[in-house]
């Protein structure tokens, strides 16, 4: 098994507490509402929404994949850190065991820096193609922008 690690950063004008509430704590409700092309729905398969919870995310028509299962590995509401793993779904195929993510929101000039670390755990000595990672980063950046625009248009939400 190989492990490949990738890091990325995005910036947002939304401060970490508000962005964390929207993007992490209420994502299962918010994202299908504002970005149905990305996520159709989310359901808890096992757990109570905390660490260890497994969710099935039904992806939207804009995705080339149909679903993924997320396992929540950690939620730190005080430091705005969220970690989870994609453990199943057509997005990981038969060459990847899981993809683990850590997302950290850091305050910066009234907004946030979103720091994301991805660990691809492969089956055997498979190499992850750069275009696969780049496409994932672009989807994530696009989703952050949709959430940011929603929060700017609805400043009363997630205070």
Swiss-Prot record:
Monomer. Interacts with AP. It comes from Fragaria ananassa. GO terms for molecular function: abscisic acid binding; protein phosphatase inhibitor activity; signaling receptor activity. This is Major strawberry allergen Fra a 1-3. The lineage of its organism: Eukaryota, Viridiplantae, Streptophyta, Embryophyta, Tracheophyta. One of its GO terms (cellular component) is nucleus. Fruits silencing FRAA3 exhibit loss of pigmentation in mature fruits due to the lack of anthocyanin biosynthesis. One of its GO terms (biological process) is abscisic acid-activated signaling pathway. (2R,3S)-catechin binds at residue 70.
